[in-house]
Regions:
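Active-site-adjacent loop/helix surface patches within enzyme catalytic domains
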Residues: 2-138
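Short glycine-rich phosphate-binding loop at a beta-alpha junction
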Residues: 140-142
Length: 142
């Protein structure tokens, strides 16, 4: 069973309030070899211009960085949007810890040897299902 530990950041997100409608869940991987706790700490740092609502790995703790009713900066606008309707304003972002076969290319998010442990995937499925139920999000919006 997963436990959510709040590590709410004080910057790098937008306050939205109770009226925010959550329609999507966006799943990312870190692009680095750090733990979920380390990435949560990274988001809390200076002017990152990025954040996610949650960070998880193979451990039993999910770190919450941004309250669900606020807007994390995870979908990106620097290169435009990929999805026609999913935006930071209507989604929850989850960052997931990857592993890498060739650690000498760890700085390359485009490398094709990133992978997830079975426990990490199990945690992600469990946590994503809980969010889907909480916000009535259909599978096609994940």
């Amino acid at each position: 069973m997963l436990t959510v530990e709040k590590r709410i950041i004080s910057r790098n997100f937008t306050r939205a309030g109770a009226g925010r409608k959550i329609e999507y869940i966006v799943i990312h991987y870190f692009g680095s070899l750090g733990t979920a706790a380390a990435v949560a700490n990274y988001f809390a740092g200076a002017d990152r211009q990025a954040s996610a609502h949650y960070c998880l790995d193979e451990g039993n703790i999910v770190y919450q960085c941004v309250e669900d009713n606020n807007i994390a900066w995870h979908c990106g606008t620097s290169g435009g949007y990929v999805h026609p309707r999913c935006r930071n304003a209507n989604s929850i972002g989850i960052e997931v810890r990857p592993y890498k076969l060739d650690k000498t290319t760890a700085g390359s998010a485009a490398a094709r040897d990133w992978y997830f442990t079975e426990k990490t995937v199990d945690n992600l499925v469990e946590f994503t299902r809980a969010l889907m139920e909480k916000y009535n999000i259909p599978a096609e919006n994940v």
